């Protein structure tokens, strides 16, 4: 099957572990989920045929859950428990670790200067964003009013883009979240946590942008 003309967001939802593969190639399948595989590969100067071959292997495995067919209230409940609650745990811990690493290793050339600041900004933005979803948008969708939620959904998508931009800054100052040889245990643990947080946030945004919001607007 040719995957190159399909949107990244669709591929991430229909092929097991495709999201992890896209993350490996630094391809944005959440905020940039509407771009085709061919377009995304071209922008990164990647060989689309190689990625297609890897996707073909992954596609042989069964999909654990196809959220495209799930009831909208079930998707919302899953998002809150799997992603919102998790982000609320992850970010305060990462901020504490970043504060320590920046203080203890201030004289090291590879220290991620500004990481605490940008993690704090992400935490503040996501906290406000998730609260608005849980208090305003999600209840509207659960009440069958998704088709009238174009305004709130547009705002949420814009905030997703802003979160994506912060992730790019965080990846830049951490050298794509790669610990240097001199990194201590806390430093390494923090980078592991940041990678996990980025994976979770990209999956979270993808599920909303590519499944929940379009279906809600379409009254499905």
From Swiss-Prot:
Its main location: cytoplasm. It comes from the Bacteria. It is found in: Cytoplasm. Keywords: Cytoplasm, Iron, Metal-binding, Stress response. One of its GO terms (cellular component) is cytoplasm. GO terms for biological process: protein repair; response to nitrosative stress; response to oxidative stress. Gene3D superfamilies: nmb1532 protein domain like. InterPro entries: FeS-repair_YftE, Hemerythrin-like, RIC_family. CDD domains: Hr-like (cd12108). One of its GO terms (molecular function) is metal ion binding. Homodimer. Di-iron-containing protein involved in the repair of iron-sulfur clusters damaged by oxidative and nitrosative stress conditions. Belongs to the RIC family. YtfE subfamily. NCBIfam families: FeS_repair_RIC, PRK10992.1. This is Iron-sulfur cluster repair protein YtfE. It comes from Klebsiella pneumoniae (strain 342).
């Amino acid at each position: 099957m040719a995957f190159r003309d399909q949107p990244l967001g669709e591929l991430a939802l229909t092929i097991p572990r495709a999201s992890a593969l896209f993350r490996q190639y630094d391809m944005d399948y959440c905020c940039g989920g509407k771009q085709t595989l061919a377009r995304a590969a071209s922008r990164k100067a990647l060989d689309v045929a190689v990625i297609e071959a890897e996707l073909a292997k992954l596609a042989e495995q069964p999909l654990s859950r196809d959220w495209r067919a799930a009831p909208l209230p079930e998707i919302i409940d899953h998002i809150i428990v799997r992603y919102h609650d998790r982000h609320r745990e992850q970010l305060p811990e990462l901020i504490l670790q970043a504060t320590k690493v920046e203080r203890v290793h201030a004289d090291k050339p590879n220290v991620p200067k500004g990481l605490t600041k940008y993690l704090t900004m992400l935490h503040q933005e996501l906290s406000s964003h998730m609260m608005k979803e849980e208090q305003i948008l999600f209840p509207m969708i659960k009440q069958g009013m998704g088709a009238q939620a174009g305004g709130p959904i547009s705002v949420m998508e814009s905030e997703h883009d802003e979160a994506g931009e912060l992730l790019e800054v965080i990846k830049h100052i951490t050298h794509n979240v790669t610990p240097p040889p001199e990194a201590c245990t806390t430093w390494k643990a923090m980078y592991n946590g940041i990678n996990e947080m980025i994976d979770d946030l990209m999956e979270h945004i993808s599920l909303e942008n590519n499944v929940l919001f379009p279906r809600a607007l379409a009254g499905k």
